[in-house]
Each structure stands twice: as structure tokens, then as C-alpha cells.
Amino acid sequence: GGNVGVWAAKMAKRFKTVWTFEPDPDNYACLVKNVPDNVQHMRAGLGDRVANVGMTLFPDNCGAHYIDGPGDIEIITLDGLSLPACDYLCLDVEGYEPKALCGAKETIARYRPVIQIEEKGLSERYYGIRKDEAERWLEREFGYRVAKKVRKDVILVPR
């Protein structure tokens, strides 16, 4: 997620256009104030299908939310946006990376972006999805390979 916009603002210095998504209303309000004009932002989360979900929020950590059933948080797919380009896809969505990637199949197939995902075991804890499933899925379905692992992030590139 976009959180409060720190990463999006940094990426905006390197890319002509940056898209960021943040479902938490408080984080989103901060994000809007923190990003430059070349950052397109939406108050929504990314997933494998359009839905409205509930979210557990941790008051002592504004980046540690997770989805937990129905609610009023909007989830969209990256494919549903029909982006004109995608060179780099970075997902730090607290274990929802496998689902967000499933909603980006067409985008990944069309643009073959460099993909960075956080992989710290939250997909298993919150959703019953193996820690490395997103990585394995990208390798199996799209022929990606791991280029580098940095702390809890995995950077994958097309073969």
C-alpha cells in the first residue's frame, strides 16, 4: 500500500508517473499531502477482484493492516485500470501480495515490469498462502526469476 506516501514520493523522482494505492483513510489523507503532482493516487487496495472488505487496523503501526472479511474498504484490480505502461511494480501489502498479483495478470503479461514484493510470511499468517507463493507463481506463470533479495523484499525480473 501507499501508506503515507514516502515511497511514492521517492519513486516520483525516478519515474515520469507513479501510481499508488492506499485503502486506510487516515494514511491516505497523509499520502495526498506528501506526494508530488506526478503521483496518481487512489484510496483503494489492490486484490484479485473488485470487492469491499473489512480491515484490521493496528493503532501503533500505520503500516500493519490486514484484510479480514466484508466491510467498506474498496479493493480494485490493477488490470481494471488499463494502465498505459508499467515498468516497475512494487507491492508491500501486508501479505496480500499473491492476491494483488493475480489482479495484475494482464498488466504483468503485457508490460513485463520489474516486480518487487515484500515476503515476510504475512500471507501465510493472515490468508493461509505460503510465504513464497507470489514468488513461485511469478516464476511458474510468467517466467520471472529472482534477481535479488533485500531484507524481506524480493526483486523479480523477466527471463
Segments (PLM) and residue ranges:
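Phosphate/nucleotide-binding beta-alpha loop and adjacent structural elements of enzyme active sites
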Residues: 2-159
